[in-house]
Amino acid sequence: MALSSKTLKSTLFFLSIIFLCFSLILAHGGIDDGDEEEETNQPPPATGTTTVVNLRSKSLVLVKIYCIIILFFSTFLAGVSPYFYRWNESFLLLGTQFSGGIFLATALIHFLSDANETFRGLKHKEYPYAFMLAAAGYCLTMLADVAVAFVAAGSNNNHVGASVGESREDDDVAVKEEGRREIKSGVDVSQALIRTSGFGDTALLIFALCFHSIFEGIAIGLSDTKSDAWRNLWTISLHKVFAAVAMGIALLKLIPKRPFFLTVVYSFAFGISSPIGVGIGIGINATSQGAGGDWTYAISMGLACGVFVYVAVNHLISKGYKPREECYFDKPIYKFIAVFLGVALLSVVMIWD
């Protein structure tokens, strides 16, 4: 019974992913979706830009509002789901690697190419601004992670120092052994969640998750066509669902008292972060148009590329989800296949871009 229940949950989740993929392909393949806007807004060559898109289009803004709703509820429900049932470890392991491949391909094939093309349209061909901004986005994201890790490590040392004089030697050994087992679960930020015991420390690390998510949401808000918005939604929501599930599992281990209430609070914070980023992106588009809008879009896409590459490589692919129990698929070859399938899927979808 338990096995069939797990299989049913995994099957339903896979069907959801297939539905999202189908919606994404329709968004790219339909000539009436984003192409109509692009065709009706083709600029004269004298403007110095390759395309001029109506970023204030009601239909485009409406699609982004749909993205906000879908992002929030998918992330929030995924975050609280571990409280009600246990997820399949193999599914989370391979799903995280798959989303890492999607993220990596999105950064390099979509964001970086769009930023570079826009800079070329702005007559800036001598210097590789797009690649420089991608490197800057990578470094900024790494700096944020380093800052959070530094604060969390210092707080963790304080907790350990305070407990040494109050615990017996046998208790210390038991705590260390239990810690080793618990640290094996969750995505890397969730691992840090498990190492902390204070409300402030946990809130800080949730803030780190939200920091990444806001920048990811900005990528949706800055989309200049409806097809771009749907594609970015699919890419980001896929990653956030797995991250939210891992976060929920870590919180249940971390908070033995009132776990449901705090899990709901943290899941809400994590779920609302990307919609906030979408709103910021919509606001940027509403205040910039023409050459100024092109500059804003190119710079933002360049930085977003760096953020996505960092999240894909350091959070999803290299560390990923660590099963709490021995898992048959926890092998490099299966992880490679999952990442490769993610890259291949996004590469095929981009044919219709």
Swiss-Prot record:
Record's GO cellular component terms:
plasma membrane
GO BP term (any one):
zinc ion transport
Highest taxon listed in the record's lineage: Eukaryota
The residue range of the signal peptide is 1-29
Q: Which InterPro entries match?
A: ZIP
Give the transmembrane ranges: 60-80, 91-111, 131-151, 202-222, 236-256, 264-284, 297-317, 332-352
Name where it's found.
Cell membrane
GO MF annotation, one: metal ion transmembrane transporter activity
Keywords from UniProt, A to Z, are: Cell membrane, Ion transport, Membrane, Signal, Transmembrane, Transmembrane helix, Transport, Zinc, Zinc transport
Swiss-Prot/TrEMBL induction comment? In roots by zinc and copper starvation.
**Topology: which residues are Extracellular?**
30-59, 112-130, 223-235, 285-296, 353
Q: Provide the membrane topology annotation.
A: Multi-pass membrane protein
> Which regions face the Cytoplasmic side of the membrane?
81-90, 152-201, 257-263, 318-331
Q: What does this protein do?
A: Mediates zinc uptake. May also transport copper and cadmium ions.
UniProt family annotation: Belongs to the ZIP transporter (TC 2.A.5) family.
Q: What else is known?
A: Zinc uptake is highly pH-dependent and no uptake is seen at pH levels below 5.0. Inhibited by copper and cadmium ions.
Protein's name according to its UniProt entry: Zinc transporter 2
At the highest ranks, the source species' classification is: Eukaryota, Viridiplantae, Streptophyta, Embryophyta, Tracheophyta
